[in-house]
Regions:
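Basic- and aromatic-enriched surface patches that contact anionic nucleotides/nucleic acids
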Residues: 4-54, 58, 62, 170, ...
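Short alpha-helix boundary/capping and kink motifs at helix termini
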Residues: 32, 41, 46, 54-183, ...
Length: 213
């Protein structure tokens, strides 16, 4: 089954899990230098495999049990969201934290300035930042395939950037991440690539905690 996100609609939790696992599997597709038709075939093959699995079997594929708990505790919806409403994972792919304290377009601008040699990074971060920039360029080259087929997965703003990063950062006097409407759980690189390519929104799944009585 393939899902098309055209408007806000409630979606089953397992659908979000399938697409998280599919995005992880998809990283290998691009390492294999497949042509467009082969990419499509591999994509639908893996999606079909996940679609035919029981949800408990999908759950077993999640290595991060905190992520799985969050997926299970939230209600999920499909929509298109603006990139300026999202913050990436702090220090995504080893970037300096200063690159990821702002929203997605701000992170994209920092990457662009780095590529233009307008800003420098520490020796410890240099190689990781170069690798990240190359990966973003690769996503842009395949953007027509990636964007419609791999929705971003979003948590409520602060779920990662505040709870998992800022609380620790305050104690250690580190730079803090700004909090926006959504934190990206899966797809930070894709989102930044879209912004670098001049796009302003993306298809997403976003989670919300159920209102408590």
């Amino acid at each position: 089954m393939q899902y098309n996100i055209l408007m806000i609609e409630k979606v089953p939790r397992r659908e979000v899990k399938e697409y998280f696992l599919l995005a992880n599997a998809g990283k290998r597709f691009f390492k294999e230098n497949l042509g467009k038709n082969e990419l499509e075939d591999r994509y639908h093959e893996r999606l079909g495999e996940f679609d035919n699995m029981d949800e408990k079997d999908l759950d077993e594929k999640f290595k991060d049990k905190t992520r799985l708990r969050r997926y299970n505790e939230m209600e999920w919806y499909g929509d298109n969201k603006r990139l300026n409403e999202m913050g990436s994972w702090p220090e995504m792919k080893g970037l300096p934290i200063e690159f990821t304290t702002g929203n997605v377009p701000e992170t994209a601008r920092m990457i662009d300035r780095f590529k233009r040699e307008e800003i420098e990074v520490s020796k410890e971060s240099l190689e990781k930042t170069r690798r990240c920039a190359k990966k973003l360029d690769s996503i842009i080259r395949h953007i027509d395939f990636v964007k419609p087929n791999f929705p971003l997965i979003l948590f409520p703003g602060g779920e990662v950037r505040e709870k998992d990063y800022n609380r620790h950062a305050r104690k250690n006097e580190l730079p803090l991440c700004k909090i926006f409407g959504y934190d990206i759980d899966d797809g930070s690189e894709r989102a930044v690539s879209y912004s670098l390519a001049g796009l302003s929104d993306a298809p997403v799944y976003f989670g919300e905690y159920s209102a408590k009585d």
